[in-house]
């Protein structure tokens, strides 16, 4: 029997994300971890864990995406999928009514408009409002990003912060 388990590895500037899907697109496993610039070591560790805990030695299809994934994909002979394309395919398959996707990376922010084709807008020249900025705010507040997210869910008031640059927002 042909195995159609697929592993998607997204390697960004600060984190590595992974999903394992079965032949029916059911999610078998997912993780979101920091790589602390040890991309190769973290990818190896993660793939070994997936093999041991999910695949149990069975073969799977692997694709890599992300801003830091191309070099690894090339060196390993693994297909590289551009991250905006992979996001569009996943959203179309799993949440087809979606019109707009906002993706905050470690060092950039992207907005994908999906109606009538795909339009992409990107803030790649400033880390304000990206994952790195959110991490800095969490550190200043002495909480993790997950804790910050939970606190935001229960917020009773919204505070205005600087809209011109993330650097100035730190003092607000």
Regions found by a protein language model. Name each.
Residues 38-39, 116-157:
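Glycine-rich phosphate-binding loop plus the immediately following alpha-helix
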Residues 1-24, 98-115:
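Gly/Thr-rich phosphate-binding beta-strand-loop-beta motif of the actin/hexokinase/Hsp70
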Residues 148-172:
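A mobile "lid/hinge" subdomain adjacent to the ATP/sugar-phosphate binding pocket shared
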Residues 8-49, 124:
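Short glycine-rich, Thr/Ser-proximal phosphate-binding strand/loop in the N-terminal lobe
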Residues 13-22, 43-53, 59-71, 91, ...:
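N-terminal cofactor/phosphate-binding cores enriched in small/glycine residues
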Residues 23-25, 32-35, 53-85, 112-120:
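Short beta-strand-loop/turn "lid" adjacent to the catalytic site in phosphate-handling enzymes
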Residues 74, 91-97, 113-116, 140-142:
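Alpha-helix C-terminal capping segments
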Residues 83-94, 98-102:
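Active-site cofactor/substrate anionic-group-binding motifs, chiefly glycine-
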């Amino acid at each position: 029997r042909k195995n159609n388990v697929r592993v998607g590895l997204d390697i960004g500037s600060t984190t590595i994300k992974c999903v394992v899907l079965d032949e029916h697109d059911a999610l078998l496993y997912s993780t979101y971890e920091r790589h602390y610039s040890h991309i190769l070591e973290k990818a190896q560790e993660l793939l070994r864990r997936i093999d041991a805990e999910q695949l149990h030695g069975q073969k799977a299809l692997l694709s890599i995406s992300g801003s830091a994934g191309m070099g690894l994909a090339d060196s390993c002979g693994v297909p590289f999928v551009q991250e905006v394309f992979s996001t569009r395919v996943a959203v179309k398959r799993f949440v087809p009514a979606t019109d707009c996707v906002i993706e905050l990376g470690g060092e950039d922010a992207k907005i994908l408009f999906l109606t009538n084709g795909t339009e992409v807008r990107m803030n790649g020249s400033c880390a304000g409002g990206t994952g790195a900025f959110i991490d800095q705010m969490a550190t200043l507040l002495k909480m993790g990003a997950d804790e910050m997210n939970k606190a935001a869910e229960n917020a009773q008031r919204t505070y205005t912060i600087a809209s011109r640059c993330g650097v100035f927002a730190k003092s607000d």
